[in-house]
């Protein structure tokens, strides 16, 4: 074969080979992108789906009881004040519950309760959206047995200093009950559901910080510096 022809043929083969490699790479990238997109926009894969559904229902109901607990502390207010800073302002009332006068006498506790109420309303809506978009589930918040028991105690606790202390201890316990499931969420949810991962990470941080804020209040204001929150699971509470 003439050398010029041989060189030309070789170049054509090299170009063809490179195009084939690039084409296969692009196909592979497309398949990965499609697979990733399907997982990100759809239900969890394998066992992650069951975990995600159970977790999202749990956190919706958990936060729902927190709304009422925080209302008892801060009070409800159907006519919100336009002022940014108003220590007497209450929260928006939860459907199904009557308007409530604030039982906490400490401005710091009422402020914390208002903030928790607003944050957890948003987190309930986000969890409902995950359930609806990924699993076609419409879940309305419900009070768990644990939540009902806590509300019964807070309802019967006299307003003022006694309520302040009871609320701080009980709301700390309530926060703690969301920590372990949310830590599990970080390693059991579908790895393509980055939005849920960030959601669970944020709950871990905010609940943990909230617990320690309340422990500091108990220590500073009521000399209860040895308080340890509990989940109600005696085995875990005694050993961990």
Where are these regions (language model features)?
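N-terminal secretory signal peptides
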Residues: 1-16, 25-33
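All-alpha RGS (Regulator of G-protein Signaling) helical domain and cognate RGS-like helical scaffolds
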Residues: 41-240
């Amino acid at each position: 074969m003439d050398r010029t022809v041989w060189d030309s043929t070789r170049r054509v083969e090299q170009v063809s080979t490179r195009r084939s490699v690039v084409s296969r790479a692009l196909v592979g990238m497309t398949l990965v992108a499609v697979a990733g997109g399907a997982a990100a926009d759809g239900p969890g894969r394998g066992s992650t789906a069951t975990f995600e559904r159970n977790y999202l229902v749990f956190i919706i109901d958990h936060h729902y009881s927190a709304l009422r607990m925080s209302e008892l502390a801060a009070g409800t207010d159907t006519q919100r004040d336009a002022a940014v800073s108003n220590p007497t302002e209450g929260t928006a009332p939860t459907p199904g519950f009557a308007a409530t006068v604030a039982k906490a006498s400490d401005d710091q506790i009422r402020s914390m309760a208002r903030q928790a109420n607003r944050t957890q309303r948003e987190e309930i809506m986000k969890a409902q959206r995950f359930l609806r978009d990924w699993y076609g589930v419409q879940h309305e918040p419900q009070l768990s047995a644990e939540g009902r028991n806590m509300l019964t105690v807070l309802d019967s606790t006299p307003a003022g200093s006694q309520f302040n202390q009871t609320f701080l201890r009980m709301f700390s316990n309530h926060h703690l009950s969301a920590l372990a499931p949310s830590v599990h969420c970080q390693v059991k949810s579908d790895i393509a559901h980055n939005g849920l991962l960030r959601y669970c990470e944020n709950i871990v941080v905010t609940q943990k910080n909230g617990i320690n804020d309340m422990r500091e209040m108990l220590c500073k204001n009521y000399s209860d510096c040895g308080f340890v929150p509990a989940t109600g699971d005696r085995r875990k509470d005694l050993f961990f």
